[in-house]
Amino acid sequence: MSQDRRYSFEFFPTKTDAGHEKLIATARHLATYNPDFFSCTYGAGGSTRDRTLNTVLQLENEVKVPAAPHLSCVGDSKDDLRGLLTQYKAAGITRIVALRGDLPSGMGMASGEMRHANDLVEFIREETGDHFHIEVAAYPEMHPQARNFEDDLTNFVRKANAGANSAITQYFFNADSYFYFVERVRAMGVNIPIVPGIMPITNYSKLARFSDACGAEIPRWIRKQLEAYGDDTQSIQGFGEQVITEMCERLLQGGAPGLHFYTLNQAEPSLAVWKNLKLPR
């Protein structure tokens, strides 16, 4: 893969054996495009811990693409996290996505020995030194639970200063929000790479639901066009592919250090954009 930019794909661990087999088949297909790594999510409050572990080990050892597990601190003890770090290190995992994590339904505030992502980054560094390349999350349109944008910028700086190597953003559909976020944190002294997270558009109702939950803004012109297509899946996907391709072109032309695709365990929507961009293989 390009030494100047990095490209990666994200999966979520499935609940069924059939779903897992499909995930691995998708990963094998995407592996032929030589991504820099695959990441694998971690359920709210660590609810998919074992499935995340098993998926990551299979991606790393069988699919032969470096795997980066998500690791969150909400609801987990330091002993739990220490055990996971030991397992990942022993398995040859060298990259981790360190997050506070989503709160399980009914949990009003973060619990556990560590409540913030910067605490987790510091803990990983204390326990493992420089073994892991640590990714953290960035929110160009502000974390949905942040009090305001300035507070959110400060929180990001804390994570970076705690020992993060790079960051992956929440997905967005307005390139200007990414460029503004990067400009602001650079002015605050943060120089780590900040890679845009990319969500292909394939289903409007699912996209709207995800976006409401995570605070990603769907611009009015995109929303109105998607609504106008109704149940015309082919038109939605064609329009979505064009919109995301054009945004990625602008991001890369503007200096973004790569792209991180949220696949939702599907290869083709991300690969359609990849091919349009003529990314290296």
Region annotations inferred by a language model:
Residues 8, 39, 97-98, 168, ...:
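Conserved beta-strand positions in the central sheet of alpha/beta enzyme cores
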Residues 1-2, 27-34, 53-64, 85-93, ...:
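Acidic (Asp/Glu)-rich catalytic clusters
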Residues 1-40:
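Conserved N-terminal beta1-alpha1 strand-loop-helix module at the mouth
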Residues 11-14, 41-45, 70-76, 101-102, ...:
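Active-site beta-loop-alpha junctions enriched in small/polar residues
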Residues 18, 112-139, 187-241, 246, ...:
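Active-site pocket-lining/capping segments in soluble small-molecule metabolic enzymes
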Residues 6-22, 67-79, 133-151, 228-242:
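Active-site mouth loops of central-metabolism enzymes
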Residues 10, 38, 88, 159, ...:
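Conserved, mostly hydrophobic/aromatic
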Residues 18-20, 46-59, 77-83, 102-124, ...:
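Active-site-adjacent beta->alpha loops and helix N-cap segments on the catalytic face
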